[in-house]
Design a protein with these regions (language model features):
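Ser/Thr-glycine-rich phosphate-binding loops at phosphate-binding pockets of nucleotides
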Residues: 100-106, 127-133
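Short acidic (Asp/Glu) and glycine-rich catalytic loops that position anionic groups and cofactors
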Residues: 7-9, 130-135, 284-287
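Charged catalytic cores and adjacent phosphate/nucleic-acid-binding surfaces used
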Residues: 39, 51-52, 63-65, 70, ...
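Long, highly charged, low-complexity intrinsically disordered interaction regions
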Residues: 1-91
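Short beta-strand segments at enzyme active-site cores
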Residues: 128-132, 167-170, 226-227
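Active-site beta-strand->loop->alpha-helix modules in alpha/beta enzyme cores, enriched
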Residues: 172-174
Length: 335
């Protein structure tokens, strides 16, 4: 194992364990620095053990590089690997074929598209939808129509490199206050997957929020209703209560319009809450279990969401990302 692989694997496990993103980035940046050196420079620093003389390499990352350079597994990587927990999910986890909600550094993710897709492929995914944010969410560097067009070109160029993993085009589009979607319809027409989520005015009154969400899930472009309550139950962003809405009306609209309800796997979200997950199941909704990953290691969060689906006795055939890619895309194209 070389230093670049070791550093990226450490970043992966730290992301998976929800360590401070700034500290994780130190390992990802160090991997980029070492990867950017030519062979002669690597040999020179390796023989002199002078890795820390490189700008951006600190004592912790230098130790990892030196240990990997010597041909041994770095102590930190061995420790992280040994401590990695089984995130659950059982048979349904094995049946999942992909992830329909994840972010790259084109919006507020921490890693390039290539690294996210390489990790997805290593996890055995058959497909992944890249769903960076839409323009109204400026705090997350949401993609304008022009930037989204450029991203689609980049994805086209990457498809052959990552085959047989299928990279699906997508977006996490904001549901605006009136229930419309925050992207040009012609751009939404070009995408494989549209996840629609509320990110603003989360505390509006129940009747208005219900109208807003029903209009969004009835939109023919919407495939998945993302993190429906918007709640946060833990984490460095603090606690945020659930939005108030008529869940029966919203989930009935999802069923009638063929929109999946997302089971968001992020530990700080656990959205929808258990009572609403049971309600959506009983109403007859289909579901999408997604990571909402903003870093490579978070792509393994699927186990959290799958365990919740198992606990709620959601039938596997009603989870859209257990379906083959062609079946999934036929479904997204049918509504």
């Amino acid at each position: 194992m070389g230093p670049v692989t070791a550093l990226r694997q450490i970043a992966y496990y730290k992301d998976r364990n929800r360590h401070d993103p700034r500290r994780v980035m130190a390992y990802r940046n160090a991997a980029d620095i070492i990867e950017g050196l030519d062979d002669a420079a690597r040999q020179r620093h390796g023989q002199a053990n002078s890795w820390q003389s490189l700008a951006g390499i600190g004592p912790k990352t230098a130790k990892v590089i030196a240990q990997a350079w010597s041909g041994r597994e770095p102590d930190l990587l061995a420790e992280l690997r040994a401590d990695a927990e089984d995130l659950g999910g059982g048979a349904i986890r094995a049946a999942l074929r992909g992830d329909l909600h994840l972010h790259s550094n084109w919006s507020d993710g921490s890693a390039p598209i290539e690294e996210m897709m390489a990790t997805a492929a290593a996890l055995g995914h058959q497909y992944c939808a890249l769903t960076d944010h839409s323009p109204r969410l400026t705090i997350a560097n949401g993609l304008s129509p022009d930037r989204l067009r450029k991203q689609l070109d980049v994805i086209d160029e990457l498809r052959e490199k990552f085959a047989p993993l299928r990279i699906l085009t997508g977006i996490e589009v904001d549901i605006l206050e009136d229930g419309s979607l925050d992207q040009e319809p012609e751009m939404l027409d070009r995408l494989d997957i549209v996840v629609a989520s509320v990110h603003s005015k989360l505390s509006m009154d129940s009747a208005a929020m219900t109208r807003r969400m029903v209009r969004a899930v009835a939109n023919g472009h919407t495939d998945v209703l993302g993190h429906c309550t918007g709640r946060l139950i833990a984490g460095n962003r603090g606690i945020r209560p659930e939005s108030k809405f008529d869940a029966e009306a919203v989930f009935t609209a999802c069923r009638e319009h063929g929109t999946a309800v997302e089971i968001n796997s992020r530990p700080e979200r656990r959205d929808p809450p258990t009572r609403l997950l049971h309600l959506a199941r009983d109403i007859g909704c289909v579901f999408s279990i997604d990571t909402d990953a903003h870093a490579p290691g978070q792509l393994d969060f699927l186990g959290y969401g799958v365990q919740r689906a198992l606990d709620a006795e959601v039938p596997a055939d009603r989870i859209v990302n257990t379906w083959p890619a062609d079946t999934l895309l036929a479904w997204t194209g049918s509504h």
